[in-house]
């Protein structure tokens, strides 16, 4: 059993789409999966055919004094979703007023992990330094840092810390881009925790959100879907549920 956190080194690198796709691929491999949206943007639900007007979620429930477990949704017999929930405009503008009220989700997820109900709990983490994000990261057995091969992410890899033991996953890699190829070759020599697979740019990754499906469900024959399935198999082989030792190159 493993808790896996996915976090972009910046916004806009495709973390939410990859989280949904990986959850789908793991359940296709026979695993029981819970996918949790920890981002106040509350977008993960839209990859699982949840209505746009659906406001419920674990954070919304906690802020309203309700049971967060009632916010869970069943997508398939082996894949459950826990949306974040919709914040009001005032809440979005004043996160310091409510973030400290969400810490109980960590003990709740610990209990779910201990129950053995799921083989995997995937958490879509925001790119921020909030207390709840740090608490959820500390709960994770493993973490993936999602990057695009560009100068922005290259700079960030050198000036901001990654979670301890995080592996780096490249998304949206473009064949024929000279600058991407140059940066990628540099990373192959300098980034010891770069995953041995990457996700190429694929129109299906853009289309699947419009279709409100994970990419592997929307188009299982797409290149990105096949690469995410390879990632899922890698996770099965390498993430046993024990925390990745800090400094490990595996």
From Swiss-Prot:
Effect of residue 249 to K: In strain: 1094
GO cellular component, one term: cytoplasm
Cited Pfam families: CBP_BcsQ
Effect of residue 15 to Q: Does not alter cellulose production
Molecular function terms from GO: ATP binding
Keywords, in A-Z order: ATP-binding, Cytoplasm, Nucleotide-binding
Compartments where found: Cytoplasm
Gene null: resulting phenotype: Deletion abolishes cellulose production.
Coiled-coil residues: none
Binding site for ATP: 9-16
Chief location category: cytoplasm
InterPro entries tied to this protein: Cellulose_synthase_operon_BcsQ, P-loop_NTPase, ParA/MinD_ATPase
Induction remark: Part of the yhjR-bcsQABZC operon. Expressed at low levels in mid-log phase, expression increases as cells enter stationary phase, the increase in stationary phase is dependent on rpoS. In K12 strains the premature stop codon in position 8 has polar effects on downstream genes, decreasing their expression about 10-fold.
Family: Belongs to the BcsQ family.
Additional remark text: Cellulose production is abolished in E.coli K12 / MG1655 and W3110 due to a premature stop codon in bcsQ. The C-terminal pseudogene prediction is found here (AC P37655).
Domain notes: The N-terminal putative ATP-binding domain is required for function. The C-terminal region contributes to both localization and function in cellulose synthesis.
Function: Essential for cellulose biosynthesis, shown for strain 1094, a commensal, natural cellulose producer. Also shown in strain W3110 which has a restored reading frame (TAG stop codon to TTG for amino acid 6, called strain AR3110), this protein. May play a role in subcellular localization of an active cellulose biosynthesis apparatus at the bacterial cell pole. The combination of cellulose and the curli fiber network confer cohesion, elasticity and tissue-like properties to colonies.
Descriptive protein name: Cellulose biosynthesis protein BcsQ
